[in-house]
């Protein structure tokens, strides 16, 4: 059997992020992720998001422009939902319950009318990294790739962004996301914590005012605030 290796040049991620994450791509755990991925594909297992969208969060959010990180857990596992951006779904796909609550909070906080589309690409293009901790999932099986090693990759990204950038906003929603707080230097960055926006979570997300708080912080550190309206 042919030995599996990592050819960094072939990873579908833009050049700035590729350089930023080069060391991670060369680590043993990333090779293990690739092995598991190829093994699943060889068994004709359906994986979301599609291969060309796995690194979509990075390809839409320029590294030089990054301002905010919104951390999700793993991709949606139903057909046509996952697009490589945490909480986001493509245009013309029914808006999931968690995203509905995010839109409700935007209305409460900034008087933004809830969008008809759940595609958050316009946020990403302004510098919002919509990062899932786990970057892939088997169809119809939530958290099915949680043992693959993706968390090591996303943890390294959070830690590296914290160390090498300043004046970022990290939005941590729910206990899983809040557990990543230890990776972030709170003397350089703003950490905003709330309950998960899922309707299954106990109260604590609605009323958090994270979107206005983030923009106030960005202005304070001399950055252009985010236009949270969905385009």
Swiss-Prot record:
PANTHER family per record: URACIL-DNA GLYCOSYLASE
User: Native species of this protein?
Assistant: Campylobacter jejuni subsp. jejuni serotype O:23/36 (strain 81-176)
Q: Which residues form the active site?
A: 74
Which family does the record claim for this protein? Answer: Belongs to the uracil-DNA glycosylase (UDG) superfamily. UNG family.
The molecule here is called: Uracil-DNA glycosylase
Q: Which Gene3D superfamilies match?
A: Uracil-DNA glycosylase-like domain
- Say which enzyme class the record assigns: hydrolase
Query: InterPro entries per the record?
Result: UDG_fam1, Ura-DNA_Glyclase_AS, Uracil-DNA_glycosylase-like, Uracil-DNA_glycosylase-like_sf
Q: What is this enzyme's EC?
A: 3.2.2.27
Which of UniProt's keywords are assigned here?
Answer: Cytoplasm, DNA damage, DNA repair, Hydrolase
Catalysed reaction, written as an equation: Hydrolyzes single-stranded DNA or mismatched double-stranded DNA and polynucleotides, releasing free uracil
Q: Which GO terms describe its biological process?
A: base-excision repair, AP site formation via deaminated base removal
- Compartments where found: Cytoplasm
**Which residues does UniProt call coiled coil?**
none
Function, as annotated, reads: Excises uracil residues from the DNA which can arise as a result of misincorporation of dUMP residues by DNA polymerase or due to deamination of cytosine.
Using the record, list the residue span of the signal peptide; answer none if the entry has no such feature.
none
Q: Which GO CC terms are listed, alphabetically?
A: cytoplasm
Query: Which is an annotated GO molecular function term of this record?
Result: uracil DNA N-glycosylase activity
Tell me the Pfam families matching this sequence: UDG
| Cystine pairings recorded for this chain | none
């Amino acid at each position: 059997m042919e030995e599996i290796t990592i050819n960094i040049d072939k990873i579908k991620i833009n050049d700035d992020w590729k350089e930023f994450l080069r060391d991670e791509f060369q680590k043993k755990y990333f090779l293990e992720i690739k092995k598991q991925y190829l093994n699943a594909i060889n068994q004709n297992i359906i994986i979301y998001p599609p291969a060309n969208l796995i690194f979509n969060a990075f390809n839409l959010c320029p590294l030089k422009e990054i301002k905010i990180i919104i951390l999700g857990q793993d991709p949606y596992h139903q057909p046509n939902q996952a697009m490589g951006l945490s909480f986001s779904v493509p245009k013309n796909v029914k808006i999931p319950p968690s995203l509905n609550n995010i839109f409700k909070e935007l209305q409460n906080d900034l008087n933004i009318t809830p969008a008809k589309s759940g595609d958050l690409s316009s946020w990403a293009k302004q510098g919002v990294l919509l990062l899932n901790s786990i970057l892939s999932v088997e169809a119809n099986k939530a958290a099915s790739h949680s043992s693959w090693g993706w968390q090591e990759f996303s943890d390294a990204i959070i830690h590296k962004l914290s160390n090498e950038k300043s004046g970022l906003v990290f939005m941590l929603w729910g206990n899983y996301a809040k557990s990543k707080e230890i990776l972030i230097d709170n003397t350089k960055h703003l950490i905003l914590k709330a309950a998960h926006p899922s309707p299954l979570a106990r109260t604590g997300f609605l009323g958090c005012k994270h979107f206005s708080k983030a923009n106030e912080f960005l202005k304070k550190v001399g950055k252009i605030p985010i236009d949270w309206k969905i385009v």
